[in-house]
Amino acid sequence: MRCVILRKDIALARMMPPILRLIAILLSVALFDASWSTPAKTTDRTSLAGPLLVSSPSIADPHFDHTVILLVQHDHKGALGIAINLPLEERPLASLLEKLGAKDLKATGNVRVFAGGPVQPDIGFVIHSSDYRQPETVAIDKRIAMTSSRRILQDIGNYKGPKKYLVAFGYAGWGPGQLEAELERRVWFIAAGDFKLIFDEDRDKVWESAYSHREEDL
C-alpha cells in the first residue's frame, strides 16, 4: 500500500491539521527565485524515538523509494519530516543568496540542494548543527536543529552560519494517525538520528546505513 501524503493544493491546505499549518508560517519561496520569511518558533518535540524514518525496500510509493526522512515534528495531530538523501543539484552559494535578496556577501563554493519531500517543493528548510541558533530555530535534538529564514543563508554566505547544514525544499507530511498506521504496516522503520549520517555520509549510502540500524520494534 502506498504511503499517504498530503496534497499541496491551497484548498486542502486550509483543512490541514495544526501540525501541518507549521508550513504556513515557515518560509514560502520559489526555488532560487524568491525571498525567505521568518517562521514562528516552536518547542514541540517528536514523540517517536527516531528521529529518522527509513522507508521499507518494498515501499509502493515512488516518491519515497529508498528514502530517509528526518522527523522534525510528530504528535497526535500529525507529523512532518524532511528527506535527507535526495539531492537535486549543486548551485553556487553566492548566486543562490543573491537571488534570495542577500547582498554584499563573500560566499564562495557551491551548496547542494535536496528534495525534502513531494509536498510543497517551493518551501525551503535548512537542517543544521545546533552550534547555530536564531529565535526562529527549532531544536530537533541536542545536536540537530532546523531554521527556515533568509538570515541563515546570509550567515552561511558570510561564514557565520552552522558548521554543518543541509538545504532542502519540500517536505513529507502525515495527518493524524497516518504515520502510526504506516509504521505498524512496516512501510517505515525508525532509526536513531545519527549526526554523521545526516550531514557527512555519502548520500548514496544513507539509506543502506540507516536501514541496517533500524529498530524492529517501536
Residue ranges and their predicted role:
Residues R21-D33:
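Bacterial N-terminal signal peptides
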Residues W36-L218:
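A short aromatic-anchored loop/beta-hairpin motif
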Residues L6-I23:
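Bacterial N-terminal signal peptides that target proteins for export
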